[in-house]
Amino acid sequence: MSINSEYLHPLFVGQVDNLALQGALSPAEVRDVENEMDQKAVLVFRGQPLDQDQQIAFARNFGQLEGGFIKVNQRPSRFKYAELADISNVSVDGKVAEADAREVVGNFANQLWHSDSSFQQPAARYSMLSAIVLPPSGGDTEFCDMRAAYDDLPEDFKKELQGLRAEHYALHSRFILGDTEYSESQRNAMPPVSWPLIRTHAGSGRKFLFIGAHASHIEGRPVAEGRMLLAELLEHATQPKFVYRHSWKVGDLVMWDNRCVLHRGRRYDVTARRELRRATTLGRRCRLSPRGQSWVQ
């Protein structure tokens, strides 16, 4: 039986109610999920609590897993799998972290619009975030559709952006927040990478903007000018008409396509426990289309 999903937003995001994630998926079910992702870019699975083994097994259906920022963090993990990212305000001893702890700073960085692991090549493909413990209020996650944002740009602006590239760096979003105390080893763990501002999605064939909080500047332009252009594009892309806000329930799993979706966490009381757990798959290396007109991933 094919999976089906109902739109939660006029442009993207589907809720899937007829697929159990705790067991093995058939090849047909994996293809169905990928087809739904190509169209909707975000899928919501309600009432699907997963342990660490189940989450890893589900994620591995969709490609090689990546560790992302763990190369920079260089800290012990609470999890049995290095590929699971701890999206929480909980320290390794299991207690809620102090307000100035790096775990909490990481939560603030996650409240900036970003694409997971855009600071590496290949970058992330899918992220799968599971809700374990939630605060009494706040802590929603927002997603914006970068395909629709690109489509909505004036044609002359699209032409101006064609061929421009931005440099993405793992620590840029942390530096924005004043979190600069990193060793040379940490700073050099993931060198900056260059990405085209406009790319083409390999699954849907749609063009999209590729920006976010890891993008530090536009190559070949003065830093100030490039950053203002990035800010203008982000302001355009995150208009309410392009944004879906997810209010979490324990047991939710949300899956999104980092190639064509930005996301951010929303504010909550950081003294209240909030635990989510993320697995992320790697994408393919970005390549130039056969006609040389766009970058495809």
Curated annotation (Swiss-Prot):
A GO BP entry = 2,4-dichlorophenoxyacetic acid catabolic process
Q: What EC number(s) are associated with this protein in UniProt?
A: 1.14.11.-
Q: How is the cofactor bound?
A: Binds 1 Fe(2+) ion per subunit.
**Cofactor(s) required for function per UniProt:** Fe(2+)
Entry GO MF terms: 2,4-dichlorophenoxyacetate alpha-ketoglutarate dioxygenase activity; L-ascorbic acid binding; metal ion binding
> Transmembrane ranges?
none
Q: How is its activity regulated?
A: Activated by ascorbate.
The reply on keyword Repeat is: no
Cite a single Pfam family from the UniProt record.
TauD
**In which residues is Fe cation bound?**
H114, D116, H263
Q: In which pathway does it act?
A: Xenobiotic degradation; (2,4-dichlorophenoxy)acetate degradation
The alphabetical list of record keywords is: Aromatic hydrocarbons catabolism, Dioxygenase, Iron, Metal-binding, Oxidoreductase, Vitamin C
UniProt xrefs under InterPro entries: TauD-like_sf (IPR042098), TauD/TfdA-like (IPR003819), TfdA_dioxygenase (IPR051178)
- The residues listed in the UniProt record as binding 2-oxoglutarate, with positions renumbered to this chain, are T141, W248, R274, R278
Catalytic activity, reaction form:
(2,4-dichlorophenoxy)acetate + 2-oxoglutarate + O2 = 2,4-dichlorophenol + glyoxylate + succinate + CO2
Catalytic EC class: oxidoreductase
Spell out the family assignment given in the record's similarity comment.
Answer: Belongs to the TfdA dioxygenase family.
Protein task: Involved in degradation of the herbicide 2,4-dichlorophenoxyacetic acid (2,4-D). Is also able to degrade 2-methyl-4-chlorophenoxyacetic acid and 3-chlorobenzoic acid.
Which protein is depicted? Alpha-ketoglutarate-dependent 2,4-dichlorophenoxyacetate dioxygenase
Task: Please name the source species.
Answer: Burkholderia sp. (strain RASC)
